């Protein structure tokens, strides 16, 4: 089995304008395709479970969907990210597509095989209402690269050689899924990833937003705030320990006491 947690990025981090993502600006991946980043309030109105399902679908790679692919008779090691994306967007409805892409209906794209400059065949997506709108593999990488950063969804990549190894991996994932379903039966309400984070943030003295204001905060900014608060608390605890003599400063690295550090490229 070959596993790599860091090779999921489809484009370099240097190509991501993280400041635009942070401020929730529309992301123009080309002249006609624009990504809209939802706010917390929009996610609440849309439905959190629906939102995460949509986000995980759009950010998926073959590894993250290998169980579904395997059950459909497809080996996840033999399908590309782009081919998977082509099959996924065909299943979206208008509401799901418009939540992220506005008037652009992803389900209206159709795959067409064209030849590149070297005569090699490659698939592209053509938008039926306006054939001048097209998505090739490079543009797909840009779209999904932004979405993965925006929603903090970075699926790992796992390859496997041999049918026995693949079947073992699938069986392990199936067991984990069944265990998760059993666990969910005992929960008092629908699972929410955002609820404990929102509750914690609103009750933290360092969080600057009121509940009514939080609805206008974009998802990336909110999740960044959660990470930054955790780093701030850890940094403060370390500094107090250092000043009190309870912690040996020789074992503390400089970035451990810098709560304003870059938390994405470190």
Model-identified regions with their sequence ranges:
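An amphipathic, hydrophobic-aromatic interaction surface with interspersed Lys/Arg
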Residues: 1-79, 148-241
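Intrinsically disordered, low-complexity coil segments
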Residues: 2-10, 114-123, 205, 249-252
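Generic structural motif recognizing short loop/turn segments at the entrances and edges of beta-strands
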Residues: 17, 25, 29-33, 40-42, ...
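Intrinsic-disorder/low-complexity coil detector
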Residues: 25, 37, 61, 110, ...
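General structural signal for secondary-structure boundaries
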Residues: 39, 80, 135, 218, ...
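Hydrophobic, aromatic-lined core segments that form the binding pocket/scaffold
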Residues: 84-187, 191-194
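Long, intrinsically disordered, low-complexity Ser/Thr/Pro-rich regulatory/activation regions
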Residues: 243-266
């Amino acid at each position: 089995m070959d596993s790599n947690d860091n090779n999921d990025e489809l484009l370099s981090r240097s190509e991501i304008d993280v400041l635009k993502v942070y401020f929730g600006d529309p992301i123009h991946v080309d002249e006609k395709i624009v990504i809209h980043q939802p706010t917390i309030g929009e996610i609440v109105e849309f439905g959190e479970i629906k939102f995460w399902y949509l986000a995980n679908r759009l950010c998926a790679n073959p590894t993250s969907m290998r169980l579904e692919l395997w059950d459909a008779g497809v080996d996840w090691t033999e399908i590309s990210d782009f081919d998977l994306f082509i099959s996924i967007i065909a299943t979206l409805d208008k509401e799901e597509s418009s939540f992220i892409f506005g008037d652009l209906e992803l389900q209206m794209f159709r795959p067409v095989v064209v030849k590149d400059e070297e005569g090699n065949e490659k698939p592209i997506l053509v938008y039926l209402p306006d054939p001048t709108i097209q998505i090739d593999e490079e543009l797909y990488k840009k779209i999904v690269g932004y979405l993965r950063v925006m929603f903090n969804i970075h699926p790992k990549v796992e390859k496997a050689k041999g049918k026995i190894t693949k079947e073992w991996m699938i069986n392990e994932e199936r067991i984990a899924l069944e265990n998760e379903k059993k666990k969910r039966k005992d929960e008092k309400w629908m699972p929410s990833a955002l609820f404990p984070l929102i509750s914690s943030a609103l009750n933290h003295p360092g969080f600057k937003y009121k509940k009514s204001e939080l609805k206008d905060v974009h998802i990336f900014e909110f999740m960044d705030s959660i990470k930054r608060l955790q780093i701030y608390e850890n940094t403060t605890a370390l500094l107090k320990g250092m000043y009190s003599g309870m912690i040996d400063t020789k074992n503390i690295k400089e970035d451990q006491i810098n709560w304003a550090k870059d938390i994405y490229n470190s």
